[in-house]
């Protein structure tokens, strides 16, 4: 199965970045302890419905964040959503983290925890209800949220997949 993914050019987008987590990592060696940092960064363009995440590691926090942003630009994905909310309920699973996304009526806003909120606001969904189930590790929660967003299908896509007219759904 040859699936080619069309790469999204980050230069043409108005990307906003958000740091989700910064970890201080210590490696114990013979001469003492080596201190470094890792940063989990989410970037997205709300108007283009594009989101991506990246992890950067460096000896200093700003360098780790910069590397995370560069990694996220190589990992951009387009999201199917309506203007006001998501088309249907979906459950995204990554490792032992699960993220449940539900459509919400206009005016509800984004009801979400830290890592899920960063992804949802980065991709520009204005009204959604979320629930994080299982482990709350920020890395896995971000990945589970993106898995859930990738599973979204609008009416036209479902009709095309089933070979039906949109009116028959």
From Swiss-Prot:
Keywords: Ribonucleoprotein, Ribosomal protein, RNA-binding, rRNA-binding
Span of domain S5 DRBM: 15-79
Molecular function in Gene Ontology: rRNA binding; structural constituent of ribosome
Gene3D superfamilies attached to this UniProt entry: 3.30.160.20, 3.30.230.10
A Gene Ontology BP annotation from the UniProt entry: translation
InterPro entries per UniProt: Ribosomal_Su5_D2-typ_SF, Ribosomal_uS5, Ribosomal_uS5_bac-type, Ribosomal_uS5_C, Ribosomal_uS5_N, Ribsml_uS5_D2-typ_fold_subgr
Keyword RNA-binding: yes
Any one cellular-component term (Gene Ontology): small ribosomal subunit
Role: With S4 and S12 plays an important role in translational accuracy.
Family: Belongs to the universal ribosomal protein uS5 family.
NCBIfam families named among the record's database cross-references: rpsE_bact
Quaternary structure note: Part of the 30S ribosomal subunit. Contacts proteins S4 and S8.
Domain notes: The N-terminal domain interacts with the head of the 30S subunit; the C-terminal domain interacts with the body and contacts protein S4. The interaction surface between S4 and S5 is involved in control of translational fidelity.
Protein name as catalogued: Small ribosomal subunit protein uS5
Organismal lineage: Bacteria, Pseudomonadati, Acidobacteriota, Terriglobia, Bryobacterales
